[in-house]
């Protein structure tokens, strides 16, 4: 039976005891197999566990591996010029190096360089509301997990400088995870994971319906059906299914191929070698939290994408069947455990990804 260092509240309700661990409705707390008969001490109503103290060798490997993946982030904002944002970044990096690079990058780009010589771009994105001079999209270089803190610090400085980002101005957040290590099967797993959870994620993030209708649509049912029926064994076959099912078989190498406008964008996989998650946005500003930009929220989004990518690599298969809907908060919390987002390091992510959902996080069917 699994052992835990301590029990914390709020509790998690166990609904199956096994020889190797416990299983929770909607997700596994520990690696589980061979169900055993529950005793008086191990009956579901008598055993409660929490995500903070759930850690085994499998989860530790999961967390270790998710941190090895590469990251790219795009943050759309306004109320700050691209030149000013680039100067702020250059000062933040301590290099003082920033310049106008539109002749090379297009999009009226201003670039800043960090101490490692990496180029951080601030580009014009016409989909953002506001005057043209202040339509600004931050495009990071390829980052590693340990660079997240640097990105967070930059986001805080941009916010303090007046930059604003939220769905009300047409601004979103796109996160790229390096596709290295993925196969047609693991990408199929990822597509099914998104198909089965994207409604839950959309509710958790309160994704703007206008963005969902245009720029971050849900997974195309025809794509999922063809993907699971044909079971591609190479990337060329996978690409054929992606583009044809999405009605975008033209211009596969074009940046603005229409297939890209999905929460999960595999067009980036075939053109950039990344998996793009386009669904994120910052909360609408309030009196307490101005300008929308939030470093903790951004880190939570990155961690979720890393965990999704890593889980897809570790599964033999995944189902596109939607999750239970009678208790969304419980469904999300147990899923985050399966993703490996346990312990203090991921507590902020768990909070951001469950706080907007209805239901009881500890009891699937109520107390």
Where are these regions (language model features)?
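Cysteine-centered metal-binding/redox modules
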Residues: 16, 24, 33
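Short, positively charged and aromatic/hydrophobic N-terminal segments
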Residues: 3, 7, 14-18, 45-51
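C-terminal accessory/tail domains of diverse enzymes
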Residues: 51-167, 180-367
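Short, Lys/Arg-enriched N-terminal segments with co-localized hydrophobic residues
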Residues: 35-54
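Residue-identity detector for glycine
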Residues: 21, 26-27
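Leucine-biased recognition of intrinsically disordered, low-complexity hydrophobic segments
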Residues: 7-8, 29
């Amino acid at each position: 039976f699994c052992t835990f260092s301590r029990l914390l509240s709020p509790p998690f309700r166990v609904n199956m005891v096994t020889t190797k661990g416990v299983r929770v409705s909607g997700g596994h707390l520990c690696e589980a197999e061979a169900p055993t008969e529950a005793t008086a001490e191990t009956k579901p109503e008598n055993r409660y566990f929490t995500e903070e103290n759930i850690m085994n060798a499998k989860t530790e490997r999961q967390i270790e591996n998710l941190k090895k993946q590469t990251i790219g982030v795009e943050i759309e904002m306004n109320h700050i010029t691209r030149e000013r944002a680039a100067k702020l970044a250059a000062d933040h990096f301590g290099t003082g190096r920033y310049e106008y690079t539109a002749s090379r990058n297009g999009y009226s780009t201003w670039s800043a360089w960090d101490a490692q010589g990496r180029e951080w771009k601030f580009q014009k994105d016409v989909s953002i509301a506001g005057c043209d001079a202040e339509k600004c999209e931050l495009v990071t270089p390829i980052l590693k997990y340990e660079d997240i803190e640097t990105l967070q610090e930059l986001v805080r400085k941009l916010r303090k400088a007046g930059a604003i980002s939220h769905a009300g101005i047409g601004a979103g957040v796109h996160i790229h995870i390096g596709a290295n290590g993925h196969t047609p099967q693991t990408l199929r797993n990822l597509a099914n994971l998104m198909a089965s959870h994207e409604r839950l994620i959309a509710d958790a993030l309160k994704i703007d319906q206008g963005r969902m209708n245009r720029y971050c649509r849900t997974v195309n049912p025809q794509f999922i059906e063809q993907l699971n029926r044909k079971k591609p064994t190479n990337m060329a076959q996978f690409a054929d299914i992606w583009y044809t099912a999405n009605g975008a078989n033209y211009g596969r190498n074009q940046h603005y191929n229409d297939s890209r406008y999905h929460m999960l964008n595999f067009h980036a996989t075939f053109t950039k070698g990344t998996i793009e998650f386009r669904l994120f946005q910052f909360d609408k500003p309030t009196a307490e939290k101005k300008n929308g930009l939030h470093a903790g929220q951004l880190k939570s989004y990155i961690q979720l994408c890393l965990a999704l990518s890593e889980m897809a690599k570790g599964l033999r298969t995944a189902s596109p069947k939607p999750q239970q809907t009678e208790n969304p908060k419980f469904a999300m919390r147990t899923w985050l455990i399966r993703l490996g987002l346990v312990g203090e390091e991921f507590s902020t992510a768990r909070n951001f990804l469950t706080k907007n959902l209805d239901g009881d996080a500890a009891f699937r069917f109520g107390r």
